[in-house]
């Protein structure tokens, strides 16, 4: 049992797991911000542009059930904004990684084969 707890601790404290946990918390908070932006600012403005339409009231009845397609439309707008923000974030992060890789690639690696050939030639000359 003690060994399993130690293994779990080692797993949970790895950098990747902690990074993932932080990303999930930040992502949840970001999702709430975007939902508020869509619900309280974007959709009311879109409603005004469409002649005073209130998306929260868009629904129809099927028997006793109420289909609230206005809320669904707001969820789609939420998704599009979050997906676009993640796309931009990944694009920026990827460009930073590529720049870093290019910097590493640009540093010349000493030509070890050339050095070895020079050493060999010098040793041959010394033996003569």
Swiss-Prot record:
Record key words, sorted: Cell membrane, Ion channel, Ion transport, Membrane, Transmembrane, Transmembrane helix, Transport
* Ranges in coiled-coil conformation: none
Q: Where in the cell is it found?
A: Cell membrane
The residues forming the signal peptide are none
Q: Where are the transmembrane segments?
A: 11-31, 70-90
Instruction: Give a single Pfam family match.
Output: MscL
The keyword Transport appears for this protein: yes
Topology versus the membrane: Multi-pass membrane protein
GO MF terms listed in the record are:
mechanosensitive monoatomic ion channel activity
Q: Does the keyword Transmembrane helix apply?
A: yes
- Per the record, the major location class is membrane
A single Gene Ontology CC term: plasma membrane
Entry-linked PANTHER family = LARGE-CONDUCTANCE MECHANOSENSITIVE CHANNEL, MECHANOSENSITIVE CHANNEL MSCL
Q: Subunit notes for this chain?
A: Homopentamer.
Q: Which family does it belong to?
A: Belongs to the MscL family.
What is known about what this protein does?
Answer: Channel that opens in response to stretch forces in the membrane lipid bilayer. May participate in the regulation of osmotic pressure changes within the cell.
Protein name, UniProt field: Large-conductance mechanosensitive channel
Q: Which organism is it from?
A: Listeria monocytogenes serotype 4b (strain CLIP80459)
This chain is encoded by the gene named mscL
């Amino acid at each position: 049992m003690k060994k399993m707890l130690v293994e779990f601790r080692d797993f949970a404290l790895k950098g990747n797991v902690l990074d993932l946990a932080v990303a999930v918390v930040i992502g949840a908070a970001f999702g709430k911000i975007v939902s508020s932006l869509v619900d309280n600012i974007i959709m009311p403005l879109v409603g005004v542009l469409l002649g005073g339409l209130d998306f929260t009231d868009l629904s129809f009845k099927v028997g006793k059930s109420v289909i609230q397609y206005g809320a669904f439309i707001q969820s789609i707008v939420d998704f599009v904004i979050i997906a676009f923000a993640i796309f931009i974030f990944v694009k920026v992060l990827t460009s930073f990684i590529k720049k870093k890789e290019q910097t590493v690639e640009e540093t010349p690696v000493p030509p070890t084969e050339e050095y070895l050939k020079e050493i060999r030639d010098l040793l041959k000359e010394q033996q003569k």
